[in-house]
Amino acid sequence: MAASSEILPESWQVFINFRGADLRNGFISHLAGALTSAGITYYIDTEEVPSEDLTVLFKRIEESEIALSIFSSNYAESKWCLDELVKIMEQVKKGKLRIMPVFFNVKPEEVREQNGEFGLKLYGEGKSKRPNIPNWENALRSVPSKIGLNLANFRNEKELLDKIIDSIKKVLARITRASRVAESLNGISKDSEAKNVDTFSPNSSDFPSTSIDDDLSINSPQYQATIPPASREGERLNTISTVSSTGSIEHPPPNYGIEPRLKEMEEKLDFDSLETKTVGIVGMPGIGKTTLAETLYRKWEHKFERSMFFPDASKMANEHGMCWLQKRLLEELLKDTNLNIGYTTNEHEFCKDVLLLKKVFLVIDNVSSEEQIETLFGKWNWIKNGSKIVITSSDESMLKGFVKDTYVVPSLNSRDSLLWFTNHAFGLDDAQGNLVKLSKHFLNYAKGNPLALGAFGVELCGKDKADWEKRIKTLTLISNKMIQDVLRRRYDELTERQKDIFLDVACFFKSENESYVRHVVNSCDSESTKSWDEITDLKGKFLVNISGGRVEMHDILCTFAKELASQALTEDTRVHLRLWNYQDIMWFLNNELEMENVRGIFLDMSKVPEEMTFDGNIFSNMCNLRYLKIYSSVCHKEGEGIFKFDTVREIQLPLDKVRYLHWMKYPWEKLPSDFNPENLVDLELPYSSIKKVWEGVKDTPILKWANLSYSSKLTNLLGLSNAKNLERLNLEGCTSLLKLPQEMENMKSLVFLNMRRCTSLTCLQSIKVSSLKILILSDCSKLEEFEVISENLEELYLDGTAIKGLPPAAGDLTRLVVLNMEGCTELESLPKRLGKQKALQELVLSGCSKLESVPTDVKDMKHLRLLLLDGTRIRKIPKIKSLKCLCLSRNIAMVNLQDNLKDFSNLKCLVMKNCENLRYLPSLPKCLEYLNVYGCERLESVENPLVADRLTLFLDRSEELRSTFLFTNCHNLFQDAKDSISTYAKWKCHRLAVECYEQDIVSGAFFNTCYPGYIVPSWFDHQAVGSVLEPRLEPHWYNTMLSGIALCAVVSFHENQDPIIGSFSVKCTLQFENEDGSLRFDCDIGCLNEPGMIEADHVFIGYVTCSRLKDHHSIPIHHPTTVKMQFHLTDACKSKVVDCGFRLMYTQSRGCLLEEEVNANFTKLYLGLL
């Protein structure tokens, strides 16, 4: 075979697929000349009789950008042409190739349907038995005849040739432009992926569709005939290719990521099995359900004797009735439109025997109700084993019980989103750089939804930068018309209650806690018991999403919903009024519209003009108000804000239906007498002026949350005495509250009570709230006595109180998980039965300066993970095997840390900063990952070996690949101690190298340490004075045994330095160079994050893996290599690196090391003296 030139190019722009005997010496020769003149590279098979082996041809197809398939009258006689076409269509479906059909003296429909003269050439004279016939048929059916060029439409061959060349140029320009756009937006893509925006789609993988609107019906010719003319919809947005009157070709965008989606669907359907499979394709509006179903159908329909794609079943049912669906399905499957099929609900029974004869492949698109499925499928007993059924729907919950499996179509990934958007926004034109940068706003807003990406692309196409910037400002305010039309159809299918809750979430409760939202909307109609399920229904319809325990909504849905709610203000839309925009609220109040239609008001008082005040009867006629929030978006934590209510007249709140009342800085002493909290779920009055909630006691049967925080005048809580279902009560900062009422015992559901900074509270009287699980009394500075008010407490916070001890009953809190007594400076002892708290995981005693011991029975705590004893006088800690983190900082009583510390078998973190009398550090547990003895200025010696049981070079499962040991400002360390630290560092580096080699770890391992000193350890075989090191590596320095790099820097901190506040890092930039290439990268050696001055010089040692070297192949391993290392500090301008060192860490075989360990003296081996 030969190419179009003597030297084969690396790739071809055009592969020409044709029947040689028909065209080679005529049309093809002229085409080749025209392509050459146009500078277009192409591939033509010049062999008269092609080889049986088509591998080379297939490779050429894979290397091409465009396949030019020229169909002539004798084309179907050539099995080589047909095999090429099969390969071409495979590449087209993968989105890796574009096909340009040319019909040369043959009709496009004959090619697609394999009939007429073309069909005779394919099937005639016994050829129908050829084994590849099914593949050829499928490929021919897939040829997009609409985008083809037909010789019959041109005056002569030259005119056709000119059009082919022109069309190829346009397509190549699009490919080049798309590539440039992708490259220029690559940074945006990386930013999007790095931020990992919580998208609406439950899945985060790529999106398979070529269509941006899966809610429109298909336009395939074979199915258009099945739909009455009046019901046919327009073509999809820029996805159906057409031939203009002038013959120009407009190509559709490629099927981005379609193959992985098809593969997942094919796995679910298992086409090779004899089992009947029913699979639902679901997802939010515009995500590509229909496109995926269409593509799947077109690929597999020829494998079944009976098949049908039923477009837009929901719309067909609305226009023609339910029974029409069944009739149309049966007529298509039985291939007889003259059958006398009635309009009963189960006509399948009359045709059952015939239907059971053959397997079927059915794709039912856009089903919206169970009734539609039941009408279409009846009892399901007419479907032959091995049949495959696919149903697409926007309602996943509706499909349950009908399908055995569902596939949720995921959103587009970042790269495909970029390409999809730019394909529509720029077309064949080059994207302007300033517009490319603005694209990220639309990409972030669309979050991979192809409907939104395509719609915005079309809207912006041809517009200038000013138009783009203007649209960005209105993204969240005004819906795109195309998006709006699709979403409006979905909205209209909801029940009235679903519509209300959908709008409530969008306008008021987006991103709120799921349980909270469910409870608030659950009580929208007190007589209804079904409201709890409305959020679940909306989730099943992909109109809301539960992510991280919160109710989320895609931005396009939220904008649509808010726009719909805003229209209710000026139009008779039968939608309740939801007001959150200050201007809308003012307009509504000034025009005195129907107050009883208001459902919710969220008023940001910081937006209200200073000169405006509100009358006390503003809410008097809002009898249906359910949600009221008055707040300030610029209000500081202390509640400073501008609120402009006329406080002369008492407010009137005759709101019987209110569910949510949030009023920041409520200015009156109590809620008015006409306020009825019978339906109240959440009461929020932070920073208010109330002295009591309301007059007397009122029934609050469904109140679950009450927040009265920082209501500094509050003294009386009796008004909430009947809140039997109250779960959370926040009284933080209520500085006038002296005590809790005895009637709180009626709060049978209370689980959370926050009384932080209730500085007038002196004691907790003997009340019992057995349901309470979390009690916060932090910074109740006058609280001297604590009584156990619930034996079911799980978290107890007494930090900052004046208590001197815990009552004996505290030992009976067997469910307690967290006990925080930080800063209890009067605390002298702990209960002897503290060890009975078997569930305790965190014990915080920081700053308890009088505490000298802990009970010995704490060793029996099997779940204690965190023990903070900093600022205490405790000298010894009982051995707690479960302990993972221990803090003993600022302990002035401890001189020698206990010898049995190495037995703390799960200890990962040990912090002993500023223990000014500590002199000795024993052997540390082998599992320890982090040690910090910063500022232990009297520390003199450490045990040798520093870490216990270092008898092997191989890490066991208790050890981690990342560890840090810091001895900063430990200026009295003996030289032996420094040597022990250095030797441990060498040993750790060797161990990590072995582990990285054994487990084939290329990244993630890291170790660093620092200690006072000015000498680079001798085991660094490359050393230099200053901050630059340039060792020369001999040939073959890089081999499979290389696992890591050890680096050392001696940092000098000047005596006149400013105190170092915050953090600084020691880094090294490495550049490997030889005659054939270079590689540059940065490594971290260590960092410090301690306030104060670093005194004297310090040695920093770090180990990093060779991942950058292993990932880079431009440095040939057999050449000598020079390494330039530049050591430097960040955020420590008055300090500098004065000496440095470097060592490559190699590993050996496991057997050799074990033999050395067995035969060598351990001490000598450990010290690295062999």
Swiss-Prot record:
Residues 198-219 have a biased composition (Polar residues). It catalyses: NAD(+) + H2O = ADP-D-ribose + nicotinamide + H(+). Residues 261-513 form the NB-ARC domain. Induction: Up-regulated by ASHH2 via epigenetic chromatin H3K36me3 regulation during the vegetative development. TIR-NB-LRR receptor-like protein that may play a role in plant innate immunity. May trigger hypersensitive programmed cell death in response to pathogen attack. Involved in tolerance to tobacco ringspot virus (TRSV). The keyword Transmembrane does not apply. Residues 193-219 are annotated as: Disordered. GO terms for biological process: defense response to virus; plant-type hypersensitive response; response to virus; signal transduction. It is an enzyme of class 3 (hydrolase). Keywords: ATP-binding, Hydrolase, Leucine-rich repeat, NAD, Nucleotide-binding, Plant defense, Repeat. GO terms for molecular function: ADP binding; ATP binding; NAD+ nucleosidase activity, cyclic ADP-ribose generating. The active site is at E84. Residues 10-172 form the TIR domain. Plants over-expressing LAZ5 exhibit hypersensitive cell death and do not survive. In the ecotype Estland (Est), which shows a sensitive response upon tobacco ringspot virus (TRSV) inoculation, the TTR1 allele is involved in the development of lethal systemic necrosis in response to TRSV. InterPro entries: Apaf_helical (IPR042197), C-JID (IPR045344), Disease_R_plants (IPR044974), Leu-rich_rpt_3 (IPR011713), LRR_dom_sf (IPR032675), NB-ARC (IPR002182), P-loop_NTPase (IPR027417), TIR_dom (IPR000157). It comes from Arabidopsis thaliana. This is Disease resistance protein LAZ5. Pfam families: C-JID, LRR_3, NB-ARC, TIR, WHD_ROQ1. Disulfide bonds: none annotated. Transmembrane segments: none annotated. LRR repeats lie at residues 595-616, 622-645, 646-670, 677-700, 723-747, 761-785, 790-813, 815-837, 838-861, 862-885, 888-904, 905-930. The gene is LAZ5. The TIR domain mediates NAD(+) hydrolase (NADase) activity. Self-association of TIR domains is required for NADase activity.
